[in-house]
Amino acid sequence: MDIPHIPVLYNEVLETFKDINEGYIIDCTTGFAGHSSGLLNQNQNIKLICNDQDDEALAFSKKRLEKFENGVIFNKGNFEHVIETFKDYEIRGVLADIGVSSLQLDKLERGFGFESLTLDMRMNQNQSLDAATVVNTYSQTELERIFKDYGEVREYKKVASLIVNNRPFNSSKELADFLSKKMSKGKLHPATLPFQAIRIEVNDELGVLERLFDSLEKAKLKDCIVAIISFHSLEDRIVKNYFKKWSKSCICPDNVFRCECGNNHALGKIITKKPIIPTALEIKQNPRSRSSKLRVFKFD
């Protein structure tokens, strides 16, 4: 079958989970099953829980992994719920690749790309909120908020004002072309960060990621490796801060002179002191991997 996707940091992910010989690994964002197929080929003693909220991605991954049918459970849903759903299973690994999939980027009708003829950007196509609603109905103040907080757009007020005074916009292409004409040029396309902000708002991406971490903490997993691939600083900051929190033995307030908590609260240890990034060769072969970062934590 034609495989339309190159998984990011593929070898690094396989290396991360190579010593797991039993139990389940949850692939929170299965997509085209690039990582999942690699993990199953590497070690057929493990079983996988393949989760995705995209119907098309799940259908493809079921086809791709059919030879492993006895070792795979498929689940449709947002990854914020997957740990709670499978809390009674022996979970030994959790993988989340939280970027937009190639499936979503390359399909013009999904509205993620600059050439898309819709203004959608929903990862779950069953939800009601889409990019058109955000762009064409949000107040200028609301747009300023998302461009500042989710896109870190330097001229967030200008972008919001331009959109409000020139809407409605009917497609991502129309919006991208408009911003390209109106905004100053730099290393990035002028629509890159505004599109990121709109996409995060539509899919509540940062909230979903935080709720995944909260569910991992609540589950009290034992002897479990958690590997997260992020693609921008907002996501990476969340991953880094949770891992740092989980690795701390002392949870006393900073103003306490002497530890009073027992100094025994660490849930595990950070495996990657610095994030793993793609090699120059991988970036050349797959330019979309350029901004990816892999961080790994191990629950004791």
From Swiss-Prot:
Coiled coil: none annotated. Its EC number is 2.1.1.199. InterPro entries: RsmH, SAM-dep_MeTrfase_MraW_recog, SAM-dependent_MTases_sf. It catalyses: cytidine(1402) in 16S rRNA + S-adenosyl-L-methionine = N(4)-methylcytidine(1402) in 16S rRNA + S-adenosyl-L-homocysteine + H(+). GO terms for cellular component: cytoplasm. It is an enzyme of class 2 (transferase). The keyword Flavoprotein does not apply. S-adenosyl-L-methionine binds at residues 33-35, 52, 86, 97, 104. Keywords: Cytoplasm, Methyltransferase, rRNA processing, S-adenosyl-L-methionine, Transferase. One of its GO terms (biological process) is rRNA base methylation. Belongs to the methyltransferase superfamily. RsmH family. Specifically methylates the N4 position of cytidine in position 1402 (C1402) of 16S rRNA. This is Ribosomal RNA small subunit methyltransferase H. It comes from Aliarcobacter butzleri (strain RM4018).
